[in-house]
Amino acid sequence: MNIVNVGKAYGSLTVIHGVSVEIPDGEFVVLVGPSGCGKSTLLRMVAGLEPISFGDIEIDGKVVNNLPPKDRDIAMVFQSYALYPHKTVADNMGFALKMRGERKADIDARVRKAAEILDLVPYLSRYPRQLSGGQRQRVAMGRAIVRDPKVFLFDEPLSNLDAKLRVQMRAEIKELQRRLATTMIYVTHDQVEAMTMADRIVVLRDGRVEQIGSPLTLYDKPANTFVAGFIGSPSMNLVKGHIRSGAAPFFETDEGIRLPLSGAPAASDGKPVYYGIRPEHFLLGGDVRADLTIVESTGSETQVFARLGQQKIIGVFRDRVEAASSQPFAMTPNTAMVHLFDAQSGLRLD
């Protein structure tokens, strides 16, 4: 399917600004961004629940802008399970097929097949009140699966689940997509969900596309400071300062603190830039001294919160770190992993 220069305006206020995404058959695409970025609005336009102001939605090579949702051959799973409390799991899953006038034998067969995929066979005769949150969400997915759509749409389906169940359901949805080999578009504000589930991620901000790419592309080569700060947990450190050229170029903060570079930077002497380094790309020791504020250990790793002058930084280390707060702490960036961004535009400097 294709999203071609799609926009949404409410009067003079444009909230989606010409978004274009080409999605090959069978791809798992995640729309991610902060609250209010337009990801759910875009999904609703794909579903036909929200009119398009301009642009085209193409499914299976056909423009579907004016088709009602029921004729687009899509199935949607919402944050709310929206199950009928007085119907069994089997009846909930097969309800849309019943409304379409499908034969009972066909409905039963498709419900059974979906239930086998989702491990719901033992629960087919139960009612929603007798199920856990994860089981209810699987019923909602089963209701979509039985329709055998060309495209699945997920609108923050895991938001109502606790942390442990979210991890489990992430894996189940990804496995479901692999088994069905059907195109899926998934909306979330959680970048961890995006990183762990997507074939490709579309990062949105204020109704505009900031970057499209595989999870590792976005992580390793963010296009700008927004993507750099949004993708990754903890997020990338962005330290403001200037490039200092010469025989051995380096980065210098406004307070005169120097950070190393590898080779000649793609920026002229004195150019204001952001020096980007992910927390796990600091090395213990070296010549850089930060002022330690907090040390947090999870057992498997240690997070070090510190300051370079007035700018906050975070380092993540596999080693156990024993250090006292308010003391100088040696942590040096791995220069091979440094990113530079233009301080004015925020764009990546290669």
For each feature predicted by the language model, list its residue ranges.
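ABC ATPase nucleotide-binding domain
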Residues: 2, 22, 58, 330-332
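ABC ATPase nucleotide-binding domains
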Residues: 28, 69-226
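Helix-to-loop junction immediately C-terminal to a conserved catalytic motif
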Residues: 47
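Conserved ABC transporter NBD signature motif
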Residues: 54-63
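Non-catalytic connector elements of ABC transporters
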Residues: 234-238, 246-350
